[in-house]
Swiss-Prot record:
It is found in: Cell membrane. The keyword Hydrolase applies. Residues 382-426 are annotated as: Disordered. Residues 382-391 have a biased composition (Gly residues). Keywords: Cell membrane, Hydrolase, Membrane, Serine esterase, Signal, Transmembrane, Transmembrane helix. Belongs to the carbohydrate esterase 1 (CE1) family. Residues 1-26 form the signal peptide. Comprises a single domain but contains five nucleophilic elbows. Each nucleophilic elbow forms a local active site with varied substrate specificities and affinities, thus possessing one or more enzyme activities. This is Multifunctional esterase. Esterase with broad substrate specificity, that may be involved in degradation of plant biomass present in the habitat of S.cellulosum. In vitro, displays acetyl esterase activity, aryl esterase activity, paraben esterase activity, carboxyl esterase activity, poly-3-hydroxybutyric acid (PHB) depolymerase activity, and a low feruloyl esterase activity. Does not possess any paraoxonase activity. Is able to bind to multiple substrate molecules simultaneously. It comes from Sorangium cellulosum (strain So ce56). It is an enzyme of class 3 (hydrolase). The chain crosses the membrane at residues 433-449. Its main location: membrane.
Length: 456
């Protein structure tokens, strides 16, 4: 009998040890078949990947992250691991669209530059609508962030679908509609000629009114809220010329109804100059960051992006909505009437770190730097794992700091340091540890039953 008890206790101890040793399975990147999210007339080469954290906020916000040329959804998930980690703690959903069939995004065809016209922009918007419906997302908190071709697509999404997107961050992008210059609707996107064409070379110039009219023509009759935007560009960029920064300023200040003269200029960190423009209610709605001597390799800073979107904390309103309640629609995926600007308090500016960066919670508003940490140097941990040190949105050179050395069209993104420690459960089954525990306990019960039937 004593031997039997010893055997049972040993089995129980072993089972307990196995339960303790079970690996924690978290959320993972999942592909969604186009038959589930798509619609007739959308490009067949566009794929959808989605990351849904284990713990979602009530009415979770959504961040779209279009990749660079030669990129894909899986790669962008790794490159933006610091933002994914924040999604785990703040409970927002991330969509990683993929256009590997074309290598780069179509931000120049008449299909993509036409509200409801289909194309790549229409495909991404369809992904957003699917996610809003399936997960009960917040239609007033949909954002986009991307670098190079992903930055170009971000600006196209904001210009063509202002009723869907609240804000965006464009790294090394170009003005909405610029990519249409010389675009061949027959051959489509991905053509190397586009990268050496007039827009890529910074040779497309228009007045602010011309740029604004172009954007407004993509959604005729729309009078609602226009998304806010951050644009980052290196002064030594030879892939997508820095000259596009001046055109971007002319375009978006006109679209947003602002003067081309900035509300202010500062230096949030050494070598980076920020110009910012405030709306009538005092909230910063457009920012242009120039990085001295930087080429096509602007660093991705997940914590700063999250702060700009107001996603560095769980729940709540978009920061612009909170600062200017009368100027921003309450949140409908069809846009709403918009409302006049100028309502709300003095606001506060949403800078991206460094000295100042207002939170803009409506009221007197003081500046409160949105992001700490320099370019690509922040490590953030969340339930999905620890993000590696930041890399750079890079092109052909690569090298240190997690940068990806892939070349191709000269439009690839340096990694988010995925080799330096992202422990996110990418592509693994998120199996329930409770089910595994039940299996072990059942096995233990079977062994105990057999022991009882043995003669003593």
């Amino acid at each position: 009998m004593d031997q039997f008890k010893t055997h049972v206790l040993g089995l129980a101890s072993l089972s307990l040890a196995l339960l303790v040793a079970l690996p924690a399975r978290g959320a993972s990147l999942q592909k969604v078949n186009q038959s589930e999210w798509g619609a007739d007339g959308l490009p067949s080469y566009v794929n959808m990947y989605i990351y849904v954290p284990d713990k979602l906020a009530t009415k979770p916000p959504i961040v779209v992250a279009p990749h660079h040329c030669q990129g894909n959804g899986q790669g962008t998930f790794s490159e933006m691991s610091s933002l994914v980690s924040i999604a785990n703690t703040s409970g927002f959903i991330m969509i990683f669209p993929e256009a590997t069939g074309q290598n780069c995004w179509d931000a120049g065809s008449t299909r993509s530059l036409n509200h409801g016209g289909g194309g790549d922009t229409g495909a991404i918007v369809q992904m957003v609508k699917y996610t809003l419906a399936k997960y009960g997302g917040d239609a007033g908190r949909v954002y986009s962030v991307g670098g190079s071709s992903g930055g170009i697509m971000t600006e196209a999404l904001l210009g063509v679908y202002p009723d869907v997107f609240m804000a965006g961050v464009s790294l090394m992008g170009v003005p909405c509609g610029c990519w249409a210059e010389g675009y061949n609707d027959v051959t489509g996107t991905g053509s190397s000629a586009q990268w050496s064409g007039p827009c890529g070379g910074g040779n497309v110039t228009k007045t602010g009114q011309q740029w604004g009219d172009l954007v407004r023509s993509y959604y005729p009759g729309y009078t609602g809220h226009r998304p806010r935007l951050q644009h980052w560009h290196g002064t030594a960029d030879t892939i997508l010329s820095y000259k596009n920064m001046a055109e971007d300023i002319k375009e978006w200040t006109n679209v947003l109804g602002l003067s081309e003269t900035p509300s202010g200029t500062d230096t949030p960190k050494r070598g980076t100059t920020r110009q910012f423009w405030k709306s009538a209610c005092g909230y910063t709605v457009y920012e242009a960051f120039s990085m001295d001597g930087v080429g096509h390799a602007v660093p991705f800073d997940g914590p700063a992006v999250a702060a700009y979107f107001g996603l560095d904390r769980a729940g709540g309103q978009d920061p612009e909505t909170a600062a200017c309640p009368g100027a921003v629609p309450g949140g409908s995926d069809t846009g709403g009437a918009g409302g006049a600007t100028g309502a709300g308090g003095a606001g506060g500016e949403a800078g991206t770190g460094g000295a100042g960066g207002e939170v803009g919670a409506g009221g007197a508003g003081g500046e409160a730097g949105a992001g700490a940490g320099g370019a690509g140097g922040v490590t953030v941990s969340g339930s999905g794992g620890s993000a590696g040190s930041g890399g750079a949105m890079d092109t052909a050179s690569g090298g240190a700091n997690g940068q990806d050395a892939s070349a191709g069209t000269g439009d690839s993104t340096g990694g988010e340091g995925s080799s330096s420690g992202c422990s996110c459960a990418v592509g693994n089954d998120a199996r329930d540890a409770g089910a595994q525990a039940g299996f072990l306990l059942a096995a233990l019960g079977l062994l105990l039953g057999r022991q009882k039937r043995r003669p003593r």
